[in-house]
Amino acid sequence: MDKKLHIIGLAGTNGAGKDAVGLILAEKHGYLFISVTDLLRHEAQRRNLPVERENLRMISAEWRRELGLGVLVDKAVAELEKDREKYTGVVMASMRNPGEADRIHDFGGTMVWIDADPRVRYDRVQANAAARNRAEEDNKTFEQFLAEEEAEMHVPEGGDSAMLDGAAVKARCDVFLTNDSADLATLEAAIQAALKL
């Protein structure tokens, strides 16, 4: 009998803790964790492009135009299928296009929106930049951080459906978490309660 596919998409604001939630689900609940941002970073490196948010946005939009709005979800599910019996399911961080949220729902999955106070998020990003090999990518002022986030929340005028639209993703989410605490145990308890794990 085929094992039922469990799929969770994580979306939210920058520095809210999407990767932390993904890692908790992987380590404590047996999910395969895939960071969509890491997939895009690898592609930027393969193309010899600077790993900057603008290039990652460009690559993701290009893939969506060429391969469909749910392409990043399909890539993650393909990774899970390589060794499906080993995992509970797949959890993907950084869903930033409504087509990705729709694709997660097509699979019967759950979309989770994670947020935190903007200053808390900015401080997290700055504190973790070097440890995550993103010092150059994340070296921004608070104002630049907020401006980049705003650019990713709405399709710009004249943009198309392949572009980032965080607000439309948020509108498609099933579960909402606030992660203002630095305590991972608090976050883990919130995840377990919200997802009924």
Protein language model regions, located:
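Walker A/P-loop
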Residues: 19
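Conserved phosphate-donor/acceptor-positioning beta-strand/loop module used by diverse small-molecule
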Residues: 93-94, 104-129, 135-140
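ATP-binding Walker
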Residues: 16
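P-loop (Walker A) phosphate-binding loop of NTP-binding proteins
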Residues: 13
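Small-molecule kinase domains that catalyze NTP-dependent phosphoryl transfer to phosphate-bearing small molecules
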Residues: 130-190, 194-197
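ATP-dependent small-molecule kinase phosphotransfer cores
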Residues: 32-91, 95-102, 131, 143-147, ...
